[in-house]
């Protein structure tokens, strides 16, 4: 049986390779700078991007720079000894023990206290990072076990760090007020600006109530809301559940911290 002969046109069509359909380029993620900006203006973009990369070095670096500058300005404008003396107003028992010392010992204690206050203040970023690790651990375990969330510890820590960015705005406000010449009589690093009811209270009158009132802070509530939104974005847990978990842990930490502060004040 004679074989079929292909025409030149048919041969060219048979030999021509099939044109490949171009694949769309993968969408690039947010830069670290864009993440920081979007945390304030479009937080869902930032937290959704954490599923791609859980890097949190940029907001931590911002915190280190701002807090270090704040501590330096406060040390120059107010002085660490004065700051330590103001802090002792919230510790009536410690204040009474200091006043019972002989004058030379009291002076020595105040000098040493000022130096210790400076060291602790400059170590604030390290202390904060440890606190973030504790908070991230508590939230990660709760979302994983209680809510069945599909979230890693690394992403949980990144959410906590990015959500804390509004607290840096509070630090900036405090730094500006100190630089502008705020009265040093009642300044403290723990509650430097009037963003909570505790700022208007006398700590020694009721240490527990003062601590609780200080925790009800505008910037802290903003941070808590961002944390809840973050876990909703990365884990698909219902927003109401996320808010209940985040604010529940905040209430626990606040009450326990206030109770310990009152017990050892």
Regions found by a protein language model. Name each.
Residues 32, 45-169:
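Selected alpha-helical membrane-embedding segments in polytopic membrane proteins
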Residues 41, 136-140, 224-226:
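A generic alpha-helix surface/boundary motif
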Residues 1-30:
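Low-complexity, intrinsically disordered extramembrane tails and loops of integral membrane proteins
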Residues 29, 120-125, 209-214:
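Short alpha-helical transmembrane interface motifs in multi-pass membrane proteins
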Residues 35-42, 46, 217-220:
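Hydrophobic, aromatic-rich membrane-embedded alpha-helical segments
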């Amino acid at each position: 049986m004679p074989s079929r002969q292909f025409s030149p046109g048919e041969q060219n069509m048979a030999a021509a390779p099939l044109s490949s359909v171009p694949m769309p380029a993968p969408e690039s993620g947010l830069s670290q700078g864009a993440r920081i900006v979007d945390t304030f203006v479009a937080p869902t973009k930032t937290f959704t991007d954490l599923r791609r990369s859980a890097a949190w070095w940029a907001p931590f670096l911002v915190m280190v720079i701002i807090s270090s500058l704040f501590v330096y300005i406060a040390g120059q404008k107010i002085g660490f000894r004065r700051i330590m003396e103001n802090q002792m107003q919230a510790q009536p028992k410690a204040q009474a023990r200091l006043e019972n010392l002989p004058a030379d010992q009291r002076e020595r204690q105040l000098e040493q206290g000022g130096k210790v206050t400076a060291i602790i203040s400059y170590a604030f970023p390290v202390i904060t990072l440890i606190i973030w690790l504790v908070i991230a651990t508590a939230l990660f375990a709760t979302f994983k076990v209680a809510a069945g969330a599909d979230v890693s510890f690394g992403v949980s820590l990144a959410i906590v760090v990015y959500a804390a960015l509004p607290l840096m705005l509070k630090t900036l406000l405090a730094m500006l007020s100190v630089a502008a010449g705020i009265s040093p009589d009642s300044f403290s690093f723990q509650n430097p600006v009037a963003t909570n009811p505790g700022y208007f209270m006398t700590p020694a009158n009721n240490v527990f109530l003062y601590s609780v009132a200080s925790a009800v802070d505008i910037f802290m509530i903003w941070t808590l809301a961002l944390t809840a939104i973050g876990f909703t974005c990365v884990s698909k847990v219902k927003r109401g559940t996320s808010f209940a978990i985040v604010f529940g842990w905040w209430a626990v930490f606040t009450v326990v911290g206030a109770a310990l502060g009152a017990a050892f004040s």
